[in-house]
Amino acid sequence: MIRGARAAVFTVALALSARPASAQQGGVIPLPARIIPGSGTFQLNAATVMQVPHGDANALSAARYLAELWKRSNGLTLAVSATAAGNEADARIAFRSEPGFGPEAYRLEVAPKRITVSATTGAGLFYGAVTLWQLLPPGRNAAPIPAQTIVDQPRYVWRGLLLDSSRHFQSPAFVRSMIDWMAWHKLNVLHWHLTDDQGWRLQIRRYPRLTSVGSWRIPASVPGSPAPQPYGGFYTQDDVRGIVAFAAKRHVLIVPEIDMPGHATAAIAAYPALGAGDDASLPVSAKWGVHSHLFNLEPGTFEFLQNVLGEILQLFPSRYIHIGGDEAVKDEWNASRAVQARARRLGIHDPDALQSYFTQKIGRYLRAHGRRAVGWDEIMQPGLTSDAVVMSWHGASVARAAAIRGNDTVLAPDPMLYFDHRQSSLPGEPPGRLASISLEDVYRFEPHDSQLTDIQQRHVLGLQAELWTEHISSGRRVEWMALPRAAALAEVGWSSPQRSWPDFLKRLASMSARYRAFDLDYADSVFGIDARLARTAGAIGVTLSNLTELKDAGLDSAIRYTLDGQEPNASSMLYAAPLKVAAGTEIRAATFLGADQVSRTWSVRLDGHAGVRRSSHELELCSNGVGLLLEPDGNSGSTEAPLAVDIMNPCWIYRDVDLAHGPQVLAAVAALPFNYELGLDAAKIRAGDNQTPDGELEVHVDGCDTAAFSVLPLAAAAHHDGVTVLPAQKLPPIAGRHDLCLRFARPSLDPLWALDWVEIGD
């Protein structure tokens, strides 16, 4: 749990003692602060006794959680018993409370006859138990554990993840599961984003329309298609109480966020009198992006917000309450006579100062009830009180400014810790932001700011990654986008800054096995297979690699493959150089560390399309506006591969095409709903230059501004859901090899046309 308002810091001696020690710690993530090797081993097996002192509730809770983890991940069943001093068994695991440790610190001693976990707090004992769990290799119910002493404590007190339950709703069972795997990584803050323009997800008894109306939206659809079913859901207060209690047992603090004054469309749709605009029939939004709907400044609106917060304070014991404050577009405030009249009465002439007034008023209410306001960094305006916590999403410079002025701050930078970005360029990534934020990017993020004094640095509480869910439509996808990047985040927030990327990868292989044991749908991108196909005379060239240079990291890595459709194993053929494979062959490949498979199996049957068909992932985007991976049918939960598109400029480059023999072009396209709130930027998008009623896919040669070389009409796809293959078009012959530009000419912004794949061949 978060204790007080200062970051925990390592002593110099402890920080200097931190070092990778894979032989002793097996697969522990995050890496402990100090590991001292011992002599001999402790033989852990089903006969081991787990003991706690009579009456020590913290020790009993930690021991029971450890027993539960080992049973679920390793099939090892150990009994937990309370024992009076002097009655300890010889071969035992003992938990004991001792004074003198920090709030989350612990000591774990492994000796040949006993293991002892010591700490002052329940959190310390819990984290000692989690570390001990990870010392047993995954999948084994008995093993020798090397003797060692681990002395450990976190670097930062705030090590968090944001879960956006507004854009897409997750079940209470999933939220509990997420809290569980957060605890395995010693992540201790769940920032729960419960309200936004697209849905209000928390039951407020005094205002039932917040959930009867505000929690439901009609999803966006392509013009002319059948109306979708309403989408939504909400958490009852009983749900929340159960989740909060579950989290407390795992020492995860839940910080609720109720967004204000912006991101308020769902609340205003439920109670129109709260809004600053004139639209009394505003729906809950199905559009992504920044909306202009703000709460107004009437006394009744502040009464509403305080009543809502009053119920929230009864549900969440957290000292911290997040009030949003980001992206509050002031257009409605500026246009509202009522808002402007109130601003004049308050003597406020600047819209940002008006938001500062709003923030201060809410902050005073929370302070009067013993809580602290947390807000996105837009709240950092003159008049911000020193007890407010600034969550910096605009980067280190904003966090630095907050710390210098004396405000506590949490680093949550976009894009580095925005986990709605895909993890790699591999084709198996789910929908999300197109730009990649890799596992290594997260691991190499350094929160320490050398420009701050030691006193100022103590205002940096820690760091947090964000799981915005506009395009993350299910709990399984949340797992993929979070894991294993959450493991890297945990190590940055807990361990010494002297971290080792190669050592982390070795430990991650063990952690990945634990993910599989708990059926978590984690991304294996760091170990995944990057395959390139090229058609050659009489065969298909296959080049395999890893995006991560595993051998350069000192790992015993290998790619192994089969050509008979069988699953690869540690004895399969070793990939050493590009292959030439006959058409019709099914090739399967996977990455191994030693004898252990660490990636999912990549497979493909080399049919007539291999080497000539390129997906939107394999093409280059013509521009870098708002690049997204989108579901091909525009709906949540599609099983088809997402489409890579820049929504500001749907345009792709197909490089190095031989046009000498006049090949044909075959393309698969999809019409998607254009559900983006872009404000004035929407005017920058090209539309209205179509030659046929439904538009065309244009093919240009050596540049996108040349005259169209060929045109594929969209009529065949205009009224179809999902992906449609357009009729093939023969390209005129031109000597040499050329780059092709493919872009859409469309009558309007909606629908958004996207390319699934294109094939250039005979």
Question: What do these predicted ranges mean?
Answer:
Residues 1-9:
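Bacterial N-terminal signal peptides that target proteins for export
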Residues 272, 284-286, 290-386, 393-401:
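Active-site neighborhood of glycoside hydrolase catalytic domains
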Residues 373-388, 394-541:
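Flexible, acidic glycine-rich loops studded with aromatic residues
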Residues 603-762:
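Extracytoplasmic
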